[in-house]
Amino acid sequence: MNINATLLGQAIAFFIFVVFCMKYVWPPLMAAIEARQKAIADGLSSAERAKKDLDLAKANATDQLKEAKLQAAEIIEQANKRKAQIIDEAAAGAHSEREKILAQGRAEIEAERHRAKEELRKQVAALAIAGAEKILARQIDQAANSDIVDKLVAEL
């Protein structure tokens, strides 16, 4: 056998092998590789979109958090103003109620004092009449009259 014929036979066999591989083996391998490349590219683009969406969501969450904090601060401020208003109203009401009670107490004290004065006048008048009766009934000397007047003064 000649080396050239062997070489030619091997070249033909190799050529047939290459054609066979290109016809039946290569297309499924290329399809699998292309599918894998497409899947990887889709995954990367999906990851990129997800990253952008995440950044956008973080920005939105930060904005909403800031807005919520501002609203909370505003609500707290309104509550503090309302609290101060309620305290002022209560203080004004308590002050007016205090003045009313004091005025009523003063009026009661004045009425009681007036009643006590009237009672005292009645008692003084009764004592004066009783003293005058005793003086007229006894009609003794000046010393006895002075003694009766002194007793009346002591009773007053």
UniProtKB/Swiss-Prot annotation:
Cellular component GO terms, alphabetical: plasma membrane; proton-transporting ATP synthase complex
Compartments in which it is found: Cell inner membrane
Membrane topology (UniProt): Single-pass membrane protein
Superkingdom to which the source organism belongs: Bacteria
InterPro entries from the UniProt entry: ATP_synth_B-like_membr_sf, ATP_synth_b/b'su_bac/chlpt, ATP_synth_F0_bsu_bac, ATP_synthase_B_chain
Family affiliation: Belongs to the ATPase B chain family.
Gene3D superfamilies in the record: 6.10.250.1580
Residues that span the membrane, as ranges: 11-31
Chief place where the protein resides: membrane
Function (record text): F(1)F(0) ATP synthase produces ATP from ADP in the presence of a proton or sodium gradient. F-type ATPases consist of two structural domains, F(1) containing the extramembraneous catalytic core and F(0) containing the membrane proton channel, linked together by a central stalk and a peripheral stalk. During catalysis, ATP synthesis in the catalytic domain of F(1) is coupled via a rotary mechanism of the central stalk subunits to proton translocation. Component of the F(0) channel, it forms part of the peripheral stalk, linking F(1) to F(0).
Any coiled-coil regions, as ranges: none
Subunit organization: F-type ATPases have 2 components, F(1) - the catalytic core - and F(0) - the membrane proton channel. F(1) has five subunits: alpha(3), beta(3), gamma(1), delta(1), epsilon(1). F(0) has three main subunits: a(1), b(2) and c(10-14). The alpha and beta chains form an alternating ring which encloses part of the gamma chain. F(1) is attached to F(0) by a central stalk formed by the gamma and epsilon chains, while a peripheral stalk is formed by the delta and b chains.
Gene Ontology terms for molecular function: proton-transporting ATP synthase activity, rotational mechanism; proton-transporting ATPase activity, rotational mechanism
Record keywords: ATP synthesis, Cell inner membrane, Cell membrane, CF(0), Hydrogen ion transport, Ion transport, Membrane, Transmembrane, Transmembrane helix, Transport
Protein name: ATP synthase subunit b
